[in-house]
Amino acid sequence: MNLTDKTVLITGGASGIGYAAVQAFLGQQANVVVADIDEAQGEAMVRKENNDRLHFVQTDITDEAACQHAVESAVHTFGGLDVLINNAGIEIVAPIHEMELSDWNKVLQVNLTGMFLMSKHALKHMLAAGKGNIINTCSVGGLVAWPDIPAYNASKGGVLQLTKSMAVDYAKHQIRVNCVCPGIIDTPLNEKSFLENNEGTLEEIKKEKAKVNPLLRLGKPEEIANVMLFLASDLSSYMTGSAITADGGYTAQ
């Protein structure tokens, strides 16, 4: 896949899809920098992986200075930045008439503004290099509306359009920008949400959730990481502004 010695910066890389991406890119001999708000989890990940190609920087992506520092840390540690994966995201379950403004703002700040801030500072280095690759984690919620998470859906719709806008604006600089739209993935974040917002055991809830798509199962984090590998590699060299759906057939129904 020609990813050896490429430097990849992944936000939200300490767990779930992000951590699967970390492992996938390390497996391709890439250098990986993880920017995550959870310092304890990030440091535990570094100890577990025990790989000189992995670096962690504690980052709140709603803070522009922190985003700039994360990008500069990647450049300083490994000598450049080839791929940015904007993966960090949150979800708050609440219908519009019950949602607090602070919760609405929090979801948009993390899921959309954080992506803008990370991209802004990564693009400066990519423009100087004359090439680059940005991969955004969107969601099926950016294509169709999941019930009871309007702020999340709105933020992911914004991610889809931000992806296309950046793709159009930076194609002439040989910077590709694409996104992946996962369906329901078996992650710690989703497990927490399942238990907080549904009746029954975790196993029972997962079985019910799996029924919504034709493959009749939840997705695995590594299955989304594999899409990211493809988008980061030369195998997708003619793709920019694209949204790859990996949802077990949910949106095909």
Curated annotation (Swiss-Prot):
It catalyses: L-dihydroanticapsin + NAD(+) = L-anticapsin + NADH + H(+). Keywords: Antibiotic biosynthesis, NAD, Oxidoreductase. Substrate binds at residue 139. GO terms for molecular function: oxidoreductase activity. Pfam families: adh_short_C2. Signal peptide: none annotated. NCBIfam families: anticapsin_BacC, PRK07231.1. Part of the bacABCDEFG operon responsible for the biosynthesis of bacilysin, an irreversible inactivator of the glutaminase domain of glucosamine synthetase. Catalyzes the dehydrogenation of the C7-hydroxyl group in the 4S-tetrahydrotyrosine (4S-H4Tyr) to yield anticapsin (epoxycyclohexanonyl-Ala). It is not able to oxidize the 4R-H4Tyr diastereomer and the dihydrobacilysin dipeptide (L-Ala-4S-H4Tyr dipeptide). This is Dihydroanticapsin 7-dehydrogenase. The lineage of its organism: Bacteria, Bacillati, Bacillota, Bacilli, Bacillales. The gene is bacC.
